[in-house]
Amino acid sequence: MNLSLISVLFLHLFFPLQAMAETFLPQDPGSVYDDLTGDYGVLGIASQFHVFAKEKTTINAHTEGNVATGVLSATNNFGTSISTGDLNKEINYAQSVKTIISSAETAASDKRSNKFIVGSNNVITTENDKIVVNGTKLDHLSVDEFYQDREDAQYIDFNKEFENLMLTSNMLMSLDPLKTYTPDDFPDMNNRVIDCTNLVGDQPYVINVTASVLAKNTPLRINNPQEKVLVINVVDAPTNFSVQSQIQYNKRSNHQTEDFSDANISWNFGNLTENLEINAPFQGTIIAPCTDITVNQSQDGTIIGKNVILNATTNRWDPNEFFTETNTHDDTTDTISSSTAPSTSESSTAPSTSESSTAPSTSESSTAPSTS
């Protein structure tokens, strides 16, 4: 055996060749409205994602749900792992992938397909029939499930969506509540209950809660036996606000699910709070389109914010849709209607009649979120 052959064998033994990445042009994803064709109410397509962040999502803990974000920094896994047949497709979108781990997203099955989209600025290759995003191979996604924006188009126009979400948040704040709760309504701090049993009306229940109620460190229980859609406006919140109250809803515990039929509670924090921390287990969708949201305890529901940081396990729980008219609290007519059917959650085939509410509100000033 000559010296050259021995040298080659030695190099292969101790320095095995790395698999060569191959250049790859993913499929054109089209528009989110090609995939989400239902009418999802005033929250629009945002309600079909666990996290919907205009600027950046930082995932530091297991995230049981899908993400749509400007920038993704994920040092932990994400994706809805439970599969019982209720959710037939899961979509993720990141315009710029800063960090992602190989185990991101849950592998497709005969019950669910995946669509994973990234922006045009990301470097995409393949290795052993797996997608490689900016140098990280994704083990749970096939080549056929991966898509990339073209330079002249974006799968989701976050500027447009968040303009609508800001209007929606203002409009919800303007609605006349059935009741407003302050700390004085809870004389027993260890037994704080918002009971919706005797509330009446065809429209979903709109309730105001002062931020000082959520600043207390004892549980707040929401009883909603009729499973009406609840919109809870958090009023008088400071610029920087921490939720210290555990939210208990209909004796439900935080858990993984793809059954969203009971997801009937949304918390609207408006557009004026800049920083929001969730420091106790929380249930319900968070509407805070201009806010940096940090979740430090378990949370179930959609999270809508400017920037979102997840430091604790969170679970997808898409809200049931509800719809609004342009009437404000100055009118005596109904302002909201809701669906009593389970959430459509990306499986709806009904054509959409509107993308989201565009009715402006005068009750709370709206400032454009930072793009920095």
Label each residue range with its predicted role:
Residues 1-10:
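Classical eukaryotic N-terminal signal peptides for Sec-dependent ER targeting/secretion
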Residues 4, 14, 30, 329-336:
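Intrinsic disorder/low-complexity detector
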Residues 10-16, 39, 44:
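Hydrophobic membrane-targeting signal helices
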Residues 11-27:
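N-terminal signal peptide
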Residues 22-115, 167-327:
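Long, polar low-complexity repeats
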Residues 104-137:
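A generic, well-ordered mixed alpha/beta core segment in the N-terminal half of proteins
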Residues 131-183:
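Hydrophobic alpha-helical segments and helix pairs
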Residues 333-372:
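Low-complexity tandem-repeat tracts in intrinsically disordered regions
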